[in-house]
């Protein structure tokens, strides 16, 4: 009975609905039963629903209340319609969501209802008053890594940065004095245990330990360290010329040589040549005696490459005295000595095991400041302030001031009026990528999920569109530790290059003195000379109880022991030794989630992964650097005699020729006159670093000028060819060219003998002017390391230093050695009650049986459609492509080689002595001086100031994570960069003419297996062609689809009689046969009679089941109406960064908001007016080290520097003055004096930040660490995946057994395997061609088979007749998915290329020309519609450009992306018949077609020829079981077999199939596992009942029918008598057991449904299974002779929409659910594809009657959420013991 107020409310609503002019009946939506009114259809003329024509419309408005027709109405009465008795129609489609009903009047107050469930989280309340500043919180956990911020504008000079990367190695400093001895360091860690010494010599009996005899000579000592580098020797005289080396390879043909120059006189030595490549070592030749000719001293050559490794040196001098020999054998025990004195305290004992937790320590020192906290919540909006008085009028407009500080937050202004729509602007140019949006609001923390099951590695899907980075959600609670997943397949990553070293951190503060180290391991035994061994120290106190160790790794299972004798009883026996570990119990109830363990130690690096797939072709690279200059070509042949000057001959003008081929690159022309200034071009890309120019004289420092404004565009300049310019200066040294070809024979040079004169001596010149100071020299190379100075005296000890601050925590120490065994701990507390053990182990192991392989298992069911696999490995290298188009013209080449040296000038007279020139370059190092006399000790110095920061030490071990450092200063926003120029679009190439048909090429090699193509469109059926000539034999085809069941064959001919054999003796009973293959599924049985009520018990939760296959995607549901705004969702998965969208249109200015977080970088602002000069700022912090400054002015003459190393080759000098006497060689100069060291130049300005370095190459794999200690026993792992089929084992040992008794007749075996192929039959005669069969119906599309190997080319067929276009075929059913292809073989590993120098980032290349049409791509997936970008701002109209010249054809474009499959176009006219194409490759097997109409039986053909023997095909899939054949002939009696070995004991498993099935539901997303001894048949989803056409059909949760293998919101269709079935066209519903996932606010759909559907498994049990119920909160015991499977709660029945529902038989295991849920099931609307928990769903459970008396009235009570399970009866599922 409804309450009074509800009835009144219903009456009011009904009355309101009937009064309305357009009222509707109530409509049930979903199952919520909400009343809907038709307010939305008010005053509309159109009908709300279409009206069926089979019904008449009665206008009831004109029939008054008294004019109603009588019950037996005739047709003549007004408003009367014939009575239509129609059958009840099917349930209609779900109606649209009705409008919201009118609000009813307020009802009377009802009775106080029961307390409701805990309400949902309320809306956030109003902001409170700002609270007082709280105490400083403890440092938070490390947050997740933030989203990378947008590139901000360049900032002002920031605070001092952290230390830069290690610079290049500096010059070796002068060796410092030897430092004082340091304080003793902290105690080191224990060393490794030394090896045991040899046995010592016997000691003497008495206590007089005299000195032993002299030992044998020790082992030869190791070679001493290399001595210091010797002084550089003086340069030796030039040696004699060596013998000629072996003849080199002949060079390539050089270019034709230039005409030879006229010779004028003796040639001078040429310029030094370019540094050559490192030569090969010369082969040894006998050295002939030569004489030395002194040549002119050449220029100093470049530093040569390192020489080859020298030969092994002579044996060194005898080594130092060897180390002491090993200790001798242990002597005999000595006599007892006198009692010694009290010994010193022994060393502390080894560290005991970890003790219990100590008392809390003292408060630590204050920590470093924590990181800046997250922005707090915005405070409450303050009240508006009072309006101030009006200010004075402002003055004239001033110049824009500098940016002011950030103003306070303004009030929210009133929204302005809506403006008129602006005119659509022209589409702007593509904008730059927009800035990344801010992070979204964080999601609510999700519910703590159950421990995940180990998932199988999914195949990688296609790369989806690049998603935008989602917001960072609040971190959810840590989930339970999942199981260790299998190792994934090797990734296809591309090997990155080795990364650069990281930036060093700040130097740490001085640490306090470390604690005393652990005790070192015992050292090697010391020498015993006169001392006596001390007495052993007393044993240390027992350590405190340590924590439990980690589980060790499980040992291997031992063999079964021999069964022991029955023991007798004894009263005084001592307790026996500890028994062996028992067998593992059943899995326990899942424990609570443990605390998060410490992070594991870093594992070894994995093996190198497979080579990654080739990346996409990158843009064309930049022009590479010029190659090295090749070796000089061979000398050309002498030229022919010279001819007259061709320039004097006037050439006759010939006819215009055809355009010639493009000429070679011309010689560089003279520089033209400078043109007028052109329009400023766009800013170029970052250019390459130029060659170092000639040093100019240092200029005066200019004052920095202000940045000028951009000038106006200049007038386009005219280009007038200028006069030839002067000869330029020599260019920079070119790179070494490639090896040139031998030149052609050159022209003969003219050498006029009358021009060869001795040069006349000139007059003496005037003294020259003082030369300009030369440019400062470049920094010299680092000097060679100086010699080690003499060891100074030890200075006096300085005063103690000031006590440093407390140091940071030291790095975490390495794991100490295992401590000594501690005192046994106290006995632990009693453990929890154990789980019932498993069945006992089998008996003693019998003699080994004879092994034989078992039969092949049946084929598995078709798997669900897998996810799209990873991109396969890169296919084999394709055929060479066609010749590419002509490339772009190359860049201008570098300057050519230096010209030939000029003629020597006439020798002048000796000039006067010039003025003193600038200081010369530092000479070579001087001869080292002799060692000085050792000085006296100096007086004690003052305490020194703190020393400089030392050089970085070697890389230390990885430390523990440090505390958070203080947050650095925020950088200043930098200036925005200028916009780069847009690239020039390429010119589209003209479409070429269609080429002629080429000749048929030779057969190419067989290609690799390609990926399966997408199904093409259904083609039009053609007429039957003529019969082709028989093709050549094809290659083996792919395995065929499983064929239909064949008809029984005819009886074969009788076999030959077998050989007679002796009668065998009666055998012993044989062992039980192996279990046969699984038979075909039986037909469904008739419904059984209702069983007796059973009892139930609740087993413990089994281990998590294996991950189920992914279900198919459901059908797309219809678009629902927009729901209300949902609660904030859970944190989404981070998507990949989306591509940046276009620049949006400017929005309407908003009201001033609250102070936001620091905004992203602004767009570049316009250039402001120059501001006034600011005040002098505070002294800034030290800046970063600047880049290398420009060369400073010439310094004062420094002191004599240390001897430098041999310098690099100098710049080529000016030509020397002519020698006074030709051909006279100068003497070797004396060694110059040591030069002065210049002063250090001024510090340069800070350089620009360089581009990021290239990622370094992958480092070498580290050495394998020492093996770790054995771990404790691990937790038993979850059930592993079914492993691959093992290889056939070796045949077992065959021992002839005794004769067995006759065995029981075995059951019918399953179908045997396919027999081996028979022998090759004889070749038959060729058969005649049969009659063409009838055309079959088109079949459904088959699965995409793997691409077959390319068949051999067939003979060309006869041309067929023109066919008429056939009717389009019927669309076939989609076939099952093809098998996943085998993984391709790894490609050959390429040779390692040389590491290239890092190139600068190249500019984007010009767009290529339109490439040739690519092959038709596979149909692409439908992409999501991208958001429409806002139109950009209209750009300025540019000047009209001149017509550009035709560009050179671009590089061929890359192959286009696969195109989207266009919709089929209209049918075209029949085309002309084309020529016969070459025979195509064999197609993939087609999908299985529909069964065609049975044709008439053809005439029997003649016997065909015997075909050639085909290759043995791969075994096909197992066929259907055939019909039983007719009984064969009785076979001959077989030979007597050998006596078999005794069989192995039978396993505890069943030797027969019981057929008793049991279903278990996990009520979670995890698939449950069958109990031990049960056989898993299938897994699925837990179906409770189906509501169809308002009738409910219930499933017994204990029967297999409640576990369906696939899930769908509507797994059924409805069929009527008119042979028509409908699917998803009615309002049918399904109900499923659900999980413990949180109840959603709105219906869920698509993949979100998965987390709410319970999983199940169907098992075959060895014996009958029942459920028993206690009707109390105590779990009932199973009856005698039964054992428990699981425990649970007594679930009886359920109801949902209307009167639908069902129940469970109490003896069925389905009445005992393992988890209690107030709403244990979820309702799914079949047609809509959504699922939800509705208020009408009710579950009924057995009540706990423990505290109530029978036959007394139940007491009404409301049970809250926390107490529900204590009022529900418990149950247990039990199975009868089969043992």
Swiss-Prot record:
SUPFAM superfamilies xrefs: C-type lectin-like
Residue spans of biased composition, Basic and acidic residues class: 196-217, 249-259, 724-747, 1106-1127, 1224-1245, 1496-1505, 1517-1529
Cell compartments where the protein resides: Secreted, Extracellular space, Extracellular matrix, Basement membrane
Entry keyword annotation includes Disulfide bond: yes
Gene3D superfamilies: Collagen IV, non-collagenous (2.170.240.10)
GO cellular component, one term: collagen type IV trimer
Residues in coiled coil: none
UniProt GO molecular function: extracellular matrix structural constituent; extracellular matrix structural constituent conferring tensile strength
Main location group: secreted
Function: Collagen type IV is specific for basement membranes.
PANTHER family documented for this protein: COLLAGEN ALPHA, OTOLIN-1
Entry text on domains: Alpha chains of type IV collagen have a non-collagenous domain (NC1) at their C-terminus, frequent interruptions of the G-X-Y repeats in the long central triple-helical domain (which may cause flexibility in the triple helix), and a short N-terminal triple-helical 7S domain.
Protein name: Collagen alpha-1(IV) chain
Source organism (scientific name): Drosophila melanogaster (Fruit fly)
Gene: Col4a1
């Amino acid at each position: 009975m409804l309450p009074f107020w509800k009835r009144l409310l219903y009456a009011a609503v009904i009355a309101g609905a009937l009064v309305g002019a357009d009222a509707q009946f109530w409509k049930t939506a979903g199952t919520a039963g909400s009343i809907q009114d038709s307010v939305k259809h008010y005053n509309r003329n159109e009908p709300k629903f279409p009206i069926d024509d089979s019904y008449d419309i009665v206008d009831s408005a004109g029939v008054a209340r008294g004019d109603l027709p009588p019950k037996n109405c005739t047709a003549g009465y007004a408003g009367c319609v014939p009575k239509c008795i129609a059958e009840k129609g099917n349930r209609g489609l779900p109606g649209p969501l009705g409008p919201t009903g009118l609000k009813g009047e307020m009802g009377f107050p009802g009775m106080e209802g029961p307390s409701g469930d805990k309400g949902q989280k309320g809306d956030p309340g109003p902001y409170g008053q700002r609270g007082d500043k709280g105490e400083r919180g403890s440092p938070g956990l490390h947050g997740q890594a933030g989203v990378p911020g947008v590139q901000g504008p360049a900032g002002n000079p920031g605070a001092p940065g952290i230390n830069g990367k290690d610079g290049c190695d500096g010059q070796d400093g002068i060796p410092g004095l030897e430092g004082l001895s340091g304080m003793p360091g902290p105690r080191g860690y224990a060393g490794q245990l030394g090896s045991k010494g040899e046995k010592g010599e016997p000691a003497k009996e008495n206590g007089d330990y005299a000195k032993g005899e002299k030992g044998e000579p020790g082992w030869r000592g190791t070679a001493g360290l290399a001595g210091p580098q010797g002084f550089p020797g003086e340069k030796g005289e030039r040696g004699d010329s060596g013998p000629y080396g072996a003849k080199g390879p002949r060079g390539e043909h050089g270019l034709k040589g230039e005409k030879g120059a006229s010779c004028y006189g003796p040639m001078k030595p040429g310029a030094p040549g370019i540094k050559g490549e490192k030569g090969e070592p010369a082969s040894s030749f006998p050295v002939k005696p030569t004489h030395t000719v002194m040549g002119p001293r050449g220029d100093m050559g470049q530093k040569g490459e390192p020489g080859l490794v020298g030969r092994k040196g002579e044996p060194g001098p005898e080594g130092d005295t060897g180390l002491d020999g090993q200790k001798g054998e242990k002597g005999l025990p000595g006599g007892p000595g006198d009692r010694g004195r009290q010994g010193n305290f022994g060393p502390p004992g080894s560290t005991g095991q970890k003790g219990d937790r100590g008392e809390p320590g003292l408060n630590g020192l204050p920590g470093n400041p924590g990181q800046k906290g997250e922005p707090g919540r915005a405070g409450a909006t303050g009240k508006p302030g009072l309006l101030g008085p009006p200010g004075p009028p402002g003055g004239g407009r001033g110049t824009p001031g500098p940016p002011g500080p950030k103003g306070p937050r303004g009030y929210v202004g009133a929204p302005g009026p809506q403006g008129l729509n602006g005119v659509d602007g022209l589409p702007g140019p593509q904008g730059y990528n927009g800035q990344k949006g801010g992070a979204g609001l964080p999601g609510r923390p999700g519910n703590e999920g159950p421990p995940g099951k180990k998932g199988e590695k999914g195949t990688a899907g296609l790369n989806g569109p690049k998603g935008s980075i989602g917001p960072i959600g609040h971190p959810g609670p840590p989930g339970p530790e999942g199981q260790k997943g299998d190792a994934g397949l090797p990734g296809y990553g591309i090997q990155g290059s080795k990364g650069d070293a990281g930036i060093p951190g700040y130097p740490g503060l001085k640490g306090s003195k470390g604690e005393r180290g652990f005790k070192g391991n015992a050292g090697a035994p010391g020498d015993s000379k006169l001392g006596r061994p001390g007495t052993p120290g007393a044993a240390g106190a027992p350590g405190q109880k340590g924590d439990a160790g980690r589980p060790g790794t499980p040992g291997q299972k031992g063999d079964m022991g021999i069964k022991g004798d029955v023991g007798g009883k004894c009263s005084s026996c001592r307790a026996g030794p500890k028994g062996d570990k028992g067998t593992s119990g059943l899995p326990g109830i899942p424990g609570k989630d443990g605390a998060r363990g410490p992070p594991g130690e870093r594992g070894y690096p994995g093996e190198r992964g497979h080579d990654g797939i080739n990346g996409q072709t990158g843009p064309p690279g930049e022009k590479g650097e010029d190659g090295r200059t090749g070796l000089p070509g061979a000398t050309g042949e002498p030229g022919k005699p010279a001819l007259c000057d061709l320039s004097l001959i006037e050439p006759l003008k010939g006819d215009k020729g055809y355009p010639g081929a493009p000429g070679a690159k011309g010689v560089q022309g003279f520089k033209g006159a400078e043109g007028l200034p052109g329009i400023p071009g766009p800013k170029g890309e970052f250019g390459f670093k130029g060659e170092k120019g000639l040093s100019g004289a240092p200029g005066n420092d200019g004052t920095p000028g202000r940045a000028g404004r951009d000038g106006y565009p200049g007038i386009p300049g005219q280009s007038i060819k200028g006069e030839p310019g002067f000869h330029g200066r020599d260019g920079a040294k070119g790179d070494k060219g490639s090896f040139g070809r031998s030149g052609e024979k050159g022209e003969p040079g003219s050498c006029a003998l009358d021009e060869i004169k001795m040069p006349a001596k000139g007059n003496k010149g005037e003294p020259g002017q003082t030369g300009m100071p030369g440019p400062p020299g470049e920094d010299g190379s680092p000097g060679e390391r100086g010699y080690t100075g003499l060891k100074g005296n030890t200075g006096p000890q300085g005063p103690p230093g000031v006590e440093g601050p407390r140091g940071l925590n030291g790095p975490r120490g390495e794991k100490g050695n295992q401590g000594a065994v501690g005192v046994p701990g106290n006995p632990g507390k009693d453990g929890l009650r154990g789980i019932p053990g498993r069945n006992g182990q089998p008996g003693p192991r019998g003699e080994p049986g004879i092994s034989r392989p078992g039969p092949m298992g049946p084929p598995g069911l078709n798997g669900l459609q897998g996810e799209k696999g990873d991109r396969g490995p890169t296919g084999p290298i394709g055929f060479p492509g066609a010749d590419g188009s002509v490339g772009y013209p190359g860049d201008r080449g570098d300057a050519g080689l230096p010209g030939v040296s000029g003629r020597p000038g006439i020798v002048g007279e000796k000039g006067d002595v010039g003025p003193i020139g600038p200081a010369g370059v530092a000479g070579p190092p001087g001869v080292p001086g002799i060692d000085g006399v050792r000085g006296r000790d100096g007086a004690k110095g003052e305490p020194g100031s703190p020393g400089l920061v030392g050089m970085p030490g070697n890389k230390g071990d990885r430390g523990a994570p440090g505390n958070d450092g203080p947050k650095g200063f925020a950088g200043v926003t930098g200036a925005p960069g200028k916009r780069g120029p847009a690239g020039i679009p390429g010119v589209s190439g003209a479409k070429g003419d269609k080429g002629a048909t080429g000749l048929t090429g030779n057969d190419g090699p067989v290609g690799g297996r390609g990926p399966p193509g997408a199904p093409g469109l259904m083609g039009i059926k053609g007429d039957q062609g003529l019969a082709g000539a028989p093709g050549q034999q094809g290659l083996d085809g792919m395995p065929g689809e499983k064929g239909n069941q064949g008809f029984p064959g005819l009886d074969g001919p009788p076999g030959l009689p077998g050989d007679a054999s002796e009668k065998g003796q009666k055998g012993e009973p044989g062992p039980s046969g192996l279990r046969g293959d699984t038979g075909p599924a039986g037909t469904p049985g008739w419904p059984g009679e209702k069983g007796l009520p059973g009892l139930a018990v609740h087993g413990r939760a089994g281990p998590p089941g294996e991950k189920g296959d992914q279900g198919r995607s459901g059908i797309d549901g219809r678009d629902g109406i927009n729901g209300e705004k949902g609660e904030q969702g859970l944190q989404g998965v981070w998507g990949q960064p989306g591509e940046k969208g276009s620049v949006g249109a400017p929005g309407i200015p908003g009201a001033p908001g609250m102070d936001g977080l620091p905004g992203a970088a602004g767009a570049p602002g316009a250039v402001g007016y120059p501001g006034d000069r600011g005040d002098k700022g505070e002294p800034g912090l030290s800046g970063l080290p600047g880049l290398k400054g420009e060369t400073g002015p010439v310094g004062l003459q420094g002191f004599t520097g240390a001897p430098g190393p041999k310098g690099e080759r100098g710049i080529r000098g000016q030509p020397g003055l002519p020698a006074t006497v030709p051909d006279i060689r100068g003497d070797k100069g004396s060694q110059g004096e040591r030069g002065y060291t210049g002063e250090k130049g001024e510090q340069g300005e800070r350089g620009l930040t360089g581009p990021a370095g290239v990622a370094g190459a992958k480092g070498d794999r580290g050495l394998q660490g020492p093996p770790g200690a054995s771990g404790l026993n691990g937790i038993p792992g979850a059930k592993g995946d079914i492993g691959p089929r093992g290889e056939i084992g070796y045949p077992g040992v065959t021992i002839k057994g005794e004769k067995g008794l006759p065995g029981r007749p075995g059951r019918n075996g399953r179908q045997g395997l396919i027999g081996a192929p028979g022998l090759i039959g004889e070749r038959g005669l060729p058969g005649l061609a049969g009659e063409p069969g009838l055309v079959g119906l088109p079949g459904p599309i088959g699965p995409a088979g793997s691409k077959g190997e390319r068949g051999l080319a067939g003979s060309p067929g006869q041309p067929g007749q023109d066919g008429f276009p056939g009717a389009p075929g019927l669309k076939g059913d989609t076939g099952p998915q093809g098998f996943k292809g085998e993984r391709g073989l790894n490609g050959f590993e390429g040779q390692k290329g040389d590491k290239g120098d890092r190139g600068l980032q190249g500019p984007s290349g010009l767009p290529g020309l339109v490439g040739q049409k690519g092959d038709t791509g596979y149909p692409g997936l439908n992409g999501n519609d991208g958001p429409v970008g806002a139109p950009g701002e209209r750009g300025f109209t540019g000047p009209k450009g001149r017509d550009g010249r035709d560009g050179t054809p671009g590089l061929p474009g890359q192959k286009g992306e696969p195109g989207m499959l266009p919709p089929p176009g209209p049918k075209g006219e029949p085309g002309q018949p084309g020529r016969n194409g070459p025979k195509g490759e064999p197609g993939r097997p087609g999908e299985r077609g529909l069964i065609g109409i049975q044709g008439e039986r053809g005439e029997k053909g003649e016997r065909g020829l015997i075909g050639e023997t085909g290759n043995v095909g791969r075994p096909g899939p197992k066929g259907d079981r055939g019909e039983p054949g007719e009984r064969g002939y009785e076979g001959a009696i077989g030979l007597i077999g050998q006596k078999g070995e005794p069989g192995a004991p039978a396993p505890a498993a069943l030797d027969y199939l019981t057929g008793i099935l049991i279903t278990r539901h996990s009520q979670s997303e995890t698939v449950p596992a069958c109990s031990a001894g049960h056989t898993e048949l299938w897994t699925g989803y837990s179906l409770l009942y189906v509501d169809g056409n308002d009738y409910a059909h219930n499933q017994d949760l204990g029967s297999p029918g409640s576990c369906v293998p696939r899930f769908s919101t509507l797994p059924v269709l409805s069929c009527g008598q008119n042979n028509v079935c409908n699917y998803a066209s009615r309002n049918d519903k399904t109900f499923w057991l659900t999980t413990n996932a949180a109840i959603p606010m709105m219906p869920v759909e698509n993949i979100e449904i998965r987390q709410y559907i319970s999983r199940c498994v169907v098992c075959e049990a060895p014996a009958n299974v029942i459920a028993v119920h206690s009707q109390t909160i105590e779990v009932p015991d199973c009856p005698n002779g039964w054992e428990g499977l699981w425990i649970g709660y007594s679930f009886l029945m359920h109801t949902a929409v209307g009167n639908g529902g069902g129940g469970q038989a109490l003896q069925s295991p389905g009445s005992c659910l393992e988890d209690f849920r107030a709403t244990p099931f979820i309702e799914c609307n079949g047609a809509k594809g959504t699922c939800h928990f509705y208020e009408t769903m009710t579950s009924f459970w057995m009540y706990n009657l423990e505290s109530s008396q029978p036959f007394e009235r139940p007491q009404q009570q409301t049970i809250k959420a926390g107490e529900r399970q204590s009022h529900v009866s418990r149950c247990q599922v039990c199975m009868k013991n089969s043992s």
